[in-house]
Amino acid sequence: MEVYTIKEGKKLRYGYTTGSCAAAASKAATYMLFTGEKIDTVEIDTPKGWHLILDVLDVTSGEGWVKCGIRKDGGDDPDATHGLIIYSKVELKEGEGIDVYGGEGVGVVTKPGLPVNPGKPAINPVPMSMILNEVKKVLPEGKGVKITISVPGGEKVALKTFNPRLGIVGGISILGTSGIVEPMSEEALKSSLELELSILSAEGHKKVVFAPGNYGKDYAMKEGLEERLIISYGNFLGFMLEKAVEYGFTHVVLAGHIGKLVKVAAGIFNTHSHVADARAEIMAAYVAHFGADKKTVDKVLDSNTTEEALDIIEKAGVNIKDFSQFIADRVYMKCKQYVYDKLNIEVHLISLKRGIIAKAGEKVEW
């Protein structure tokens, strides 16, 4: 698929989803089953409005069935499922209608809170609709088929995805709301993060831990918190706080490295460096608030990391405990303002060299 976009100065190629692959393979197999004609390509429409022409692979057939595959192309997105072949076996069945099942390498949902009910194959609603719509285009009137989607290698690849955390076992999910993979899509990551919250909420949890990365997650686990209650949100703290309110959570522990959380102290809730990288400026402003001289402020402004800035601040005679507490208090205040005081929030501020350097907010009892 040779369609591109430009992001952060880089030319990136679009791909197509496992849902598009499943729909295309199902349409191709159905067409070949009823016409007896072998085809090399198949055309489908996607919810995004793009028309795809995809290569049909590994065609096999027998009495009353045809099976074929479509290779997943994730474009320039870092997608674990890129290169997998999504197969569809289409069999004649008595009566009319289309029945869709999951086979080898397609996960099974085990927990509530997902778009698919527990016990069902992890074929999301939009891909399921795509499969049905594309097959109907080539299914003769009055005929019925049984469709089985399979993904050889899917069970192994699924371990590299969110599925284990989401309670989807045995394989990958057949996904895609648009049919198209947008490279480096923020929306795809946000959707995955929201699913984690959705599952915890469906299980009755009211308390959750948010960590921007591994430092916060590792710290929370050392504190004895259950790993599945810890969500690594990356850069999307604002989004996750909003969703925590939406899903009825009452308590959030925010545990993270000062390099991420100092941005939150200044009211920055998307902490990606391309959105806002003002760490040095924020710390310089705060150390000036603590009475540091211009030389110290300049050194902090020139620092490469927040850890280096802390060293500079400490050498200048500023009480690091008080300074860190000031930051933690502001993180807490900004988060409370962001959710209009609808969550109880506890902040744990971490330094690589110093460990936990400050806590603020309401103590969350587990």
Swiss-Prot record:
GO terms for biological process: anaerobic cobalamin biosynthetic process; methylation. It catalyses: Co-precorrin-5B + S-adenosyl-L-methionine = Co-precorrin-6A + S-adenosyl-L-homocysteine. Pathway: Cofactor biosynthesis; adenosylcobalamin biosynthesis; cob(II)yrinate a,c-diamide from sirohydrochlorin (anaerobic route): step 6/10. One of its GO terms (molecular function) is cobalt-precorrin-5B C1-methyltransferase activity. Coiled coil: none annotated. Disulfide bonds: none annotated. InterPro entries: CbiD (IPR002748), CbiD_sf (IPR036074). HAMAP family: CbiD (MF_00787). NCBIfam families: cbiD, PRK00075.1-1. This is Cobalt-precorrin-5B C(1)-methyltransferase. It comes from Thermoanaerobacter sp. (strain X514). The gene is cbiD.
